[in-house]
């Protein structure tokens, strides 16, 4: 009889403790305005991202096997960049261009050839900057035509609506986590 009573008492105690744990802090209504709202938002979004990273078990890192491939590709891209720069130099001797196509010369090998050619650094800079400005203008016009700017406005308006609501009425942690 005593054993049955204790088991029922233990069951009631477990149910009550489970009920107390079941009320999450996310349902608590918080009022925050201005800086307090921003700090709360940062705290909530930061805790969400840290929680995700701490739940993942990370394996020990090993050295990448493709390291030589990465180094060789960076050397190749450096040579391509140098060849691209040399296209902008009009008075460059053909011997130097042929040397570049055969192998990648060091700067010391290039220096005498560059002294012989009458290079005007300002002309090179103007031509490079002119092409960069044209590329920037094209990318900005493409962005204006796309709907990316409209999406950012919508997201910003959602954020403003939540901040006003949290200041005047109050909001829950779950609602703030939706903005992350």
Swiss-Prot record:
<keyword id="KW-0732">Signal</keyword>
<feature type="disulfide bond">
    <location>
        <begin position="166"/>
        <end position="171"/>
    </location>
</feature>
<feature type="disulfide bond" description="Interchain (between B and A chains)">
    <location>
        <begin position="33"/>
        <end position="167"/>
    </location>
</feature>
<protein>
    <recommendedName>
        <fullName>Prorelaxin</fullName>
    </recommendedName>
</protein>
<dbReference type="InterPro" id="IPR022421">
    <property type="entry name" value="Relaxin"/>
</dbReference>
<dbReference type="InterPro" id="IPR016179">
    <property type="entry name" value="Insulin-like"/>
</dbReference>
<keyword id="KW-0372">Hormone</keyword>
<comment type="similarity">
    <text>Belongs to the insulin family.</text>
</comment>
<comment type="subunit">
    <text>Heterodimer of a B chain and an A chain linked by two disulfide bonds.</text>
</comment>
<keyword id="KW-0964">Secreted</keyword>
<feature type="disulfide bond" description="Interchain (between B and A chains)">
    <location>
        <begin position="45"/>
        <end position="180"/>
    </location>
</feature>
<dbReference type="InterPro" id="IPR022353">
    <property type="entry name" value="Insulin_CS"/>
</dbReference>
<dbReference type="GO" id="GO:0005179">
    <property type="term" value="F:hormone activity"/>
</dbReference>
<dbReference type="InterPro" id="IPR036438">
    <property type="entry name" value="Insulin-like_sf"/>
</dbReference>
<dbReference type="Pfam" id="PF00049">
    <property type="entry name" value="Insulin"/>
</dbReference>
<keyword id="KW-0165">Cleavage on pair of basic residues</keyword>
<comment type="function">
    <text>Relaxin is an ovarian hormone that acts with estrogen to produce dilatation of the birth canal in many mammals.</text>
</comment>
<feature type="signal peptide">
    <location>
        <begin position="1"/>
        <end position="25"/>
    </location>
</feature>
<dbReference type="GO" id="GO:0005576">
    <property type="term" value="C:extracellular region"/>
</dbReference>
<dbReference type="InterPro" id="IPR051042">
    <property type="entry name" value="Repro_Hormone_Insulin-like"/>
</dbReference>
<keyword id="KW-1015">Disulfide bond</keyword>
<feature type="propeptide" description="Connecting peptide">
    <location>
        <begin position="53"/>
        <end position="154"/>
    </location>
</feature>
